[in-house]
Design a protein with these regions (language model features):
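Short, glycine-/aromatic-enriched active-site segment of Class I SAM-dependent methyltransferases
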Residues: 208-226
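Conserved beta-strand signature within the Rossmann-like core of class I S-adenosyl-L-methionine
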Residues: 161, 180, 187-202
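A short, conserved alpha-helix within the catalytic core of class I
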Residues: 147-148, 170-183
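Short amphipathic alpha-helix with an adjacent loop that forms part of the alpha/beta core around
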Residues: 146-156
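Rossmann-like AdoMet
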Residues: 1-86, 90-138, 156
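Short alpha-helix
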Residues: 226-244
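Core SAM-dependent methyltransferase catalytic element
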Residues: 253-269
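A short SAM/SAH-binding and catalytic strip from SAM-dependent methyltransferases
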Residues: 159-175
Length: 269
């Protein structure tokens, strides 16, 4: 009997340039530290770079989309009220810095090594003073079960909110299932919530997603972003239920096509 060939390891670092382009775009929003971080990276060229980005088709609508997505995860974190937060695939979002600046939260902010190193440097420059909480920026492959559980085990006692936005659309079914298993094991041991702003549906009628902010058509196709979305709301809920979760809260994104929601999930007992 022939064995099924193993899949070649994916190079997830190819996703990282999207985080840089999103930071530039978010510098035109109210998102905490986005403008200051962009200025550290692009210096005086930020206004010109942002102005150029905003000339793209549907730019302002997409800016609202990403700002709303960010704020929806903030709301879910507030409602969850967990003393510990693990954010996975956080990119160049500085939610952890803002939350630990203002609250006694213990926050572990993670992404792939290059992005985590860049963010750690930016955090030091953005807020060199003491924080109300504790912020740790570190590298983590969220699909690595052992590394995931070790990261959670290093958190102080108490329930954990595991948060993500902009991650699931880069993962295929097998990878999403592995991530869900890692989160489920962590929350079974510690209690808490999985908070995801990534419940995206495929574009209606098979229409192509909008290209912009450094995401070329080749980038979108190479990462199979459209294929990685859920086919409908029932399919999305079925995925999480099959992984051992129940949906305890939903925040709908105000959009005429209604293609994204943010969900809070608990381990099904």
């Amino acid at each position: 009997m022939s064995s099924r060939p193993k899949e070649a390891p994916r190079d997830y670092s190819t996703i990282s340039p999207s985080a840089l382009s999103l930071l530039l775009m978010k510098s035109g929003s109210s998102i905490a530290f986005a403008k200051q971080a962009a200025a550290l990276l692009w210096n005086d060229s930020v206004p010109d770079e942002l102005a150029h980005a905003m000339t793209e088709e549907n730019a302002r609508r997409r800016l609202r989309h990403f700002e709303n997505r960010y704020l929806s995860l903030d709301r879910l974190l507030f409602h969850a009220g967990c003393p510990n937060v693990l954010e996975i695939g956080s990119g160049l979002s500085f939610r952890g810095l803002e939350l630990t600046r203002t609250t006694p939260t213990h926050y572990v902010d993670t992404d792939l090594p290059a992005l985590a190193a860049l963010k750690a440097e930016l955090v030091t420059r953005l807020h060199p003073g003491p924080l109300a909480g504790t912020l740790r920026v570190q590298a983590l492959d969220a699909l690595d079960s052992q590394a995931f559980q070790s990261t959670v085990a290093a958190l102080p006692d108490g329930p954990v909110a595991i948060a993500n936005e902009g991650l699931l659309v880069y993962l295929n079914e097998r990878e999403k299932a592995q991530l869900a298993a890692n989160v489920h094991a962590a929350l079974t041991a510690r209690g808490g919530r999985w908070l995801t702003a990534d419940v995206y549906l495929k574009n209606p009628g098979g229409s192509a997603p909008t290209v912009g902010y450094g995401r070329s058509r080749a980038f979108i196709d190479a990462h199979r972003i459209e294929q990685n979305k859920f086919s409908d709301w029932s399919a999305a809920e079925r995925f999480f239920v099959d992984a051992g979760f129940e949906v305890v809260d939903k925040l709908a994104h105000a959009h005429p096509l209604h293609v994204r929601e943010s969900w809070a999930l608990a381990v099904r007992r």
